[in-house]
């Protein structure tokens, strides 16, 4: 079994589930998972986890994300992007400066209402299923955080911008909210995800490129190790005589590591065996003076 992470450059018209299905065929294994849905029309970075790395899917989904989007002003659709049914069209009587002020006003924390065409569940039903049935339900606003907003090009009625945002941010909804603030409406014309955490588009592979690597017996060249997700965490190595504790997912005492370091309570550390094999994420418990396992990644072929 292959254990690791591959950064997919998702192309248009593929769903995230389509990508997972393709990767199962390329890798020849069932244990494959994606780390956050991209709409079929969207392109860009989609980290896919293989084998033991599927345990980090939820962790990657929580990471900050970067997008480049195109906003079409003067158009409103039911899906908040150009794939949906047009609900209203008007001439956007706005200036470039008005657009700039409106867009940049969303930087920081703001309250966003999730779109009906989304995979969020209400009373056990996905919102998009209700929307397709012609039903609309009340959605609670959620706090999202926009760390950076940069206008890349303004050729009215189209505005291209870059955004770095927290998990759970809908760029379609951001586009609609900008249009509403300008009084002319707006919809998302295109979307490309350029980064998920430290994983960037320039390091991504298309499905075709991965198939070519597979055919040439070089697929593992594209696979990142599981611990690449935790690059900011300090490293500890368990001494050889205590490896059995590590293999069983037990707590580890500081003196049972080569470094004997004490880190701040609850600070995550990467725990390795004496042979440099990554085994898991641990956190220090100050009251018990030990490192407790947070999540284990014992790789078994």
Model regions and ranges:
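Accessory RNA 3′-end/elbow-binding domains used by RNA modification enzymes
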Residues: 1-11, 17-34, 38, 42-45, ...
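Catalytic cores of RNA-modifying enzymes
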Residues: 1-167, 173-205
């Amino acid at each position: 079994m292959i254990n690791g992470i591959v950064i997919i450059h998702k192309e248009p018209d593929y769903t995230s589930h389509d990508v997972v299905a393709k990767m199962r065929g390329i890798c020849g294994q069932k244990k494959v998972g994606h780390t956050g849905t991209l709409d079929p029309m969207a392109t860009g970075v989609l980290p896919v986890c293989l084998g033991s790395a599927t345990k980090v899917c939820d962790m990657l989904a929580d990471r900050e994300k970067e997008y480049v989007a195109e906003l079409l002003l003067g158009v409103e659709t039911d899906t908040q992007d150009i794939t949906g049914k047009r609900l209203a069209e008007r001439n956007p009587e706005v200036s470039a400066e008005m657009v700039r002020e409106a867009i940049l006003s969303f930087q920081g924390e703001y309250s966003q209402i999730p779109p009906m065409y989304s995979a969020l569940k209400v009373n056990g039903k996905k919102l998009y299923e209700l929307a397709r049935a012609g039903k609309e339900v009340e959605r609670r606003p959620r706090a999202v955080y926009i760390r950076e907003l940069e206008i890349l090009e303004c050729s009215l009625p189209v505005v291209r911008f870059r955004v770095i945002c927290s998990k759970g941010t809908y760029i379609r909804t951001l586009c609609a909210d900008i249009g509403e603030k300008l009084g002319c409406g707006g919809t998302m014309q295109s979307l490309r995800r350029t980064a998920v955490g430290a994983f960037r588009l320039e390091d991504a592979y298309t499905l075709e490129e991965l198939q070519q690597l597979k055919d040439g017996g070089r697929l593992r060249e594209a696979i990142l190790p599981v611990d690449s997700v935790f690059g900011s965490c300090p490293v500890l190595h368990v001494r050889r005589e205590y490896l059995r504790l590590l293999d069983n997912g037990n707590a580890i005492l500081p003196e049972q590591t080569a470094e004997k370091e004490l880190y701040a309570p609850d600070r995550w550390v990467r725990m390795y065996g004496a042979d440099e094999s990554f085994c898991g994420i641990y956190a220090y418990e100050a009251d018990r003076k030990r490192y407790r396992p947070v999540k284990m990644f014992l790789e078994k072929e």
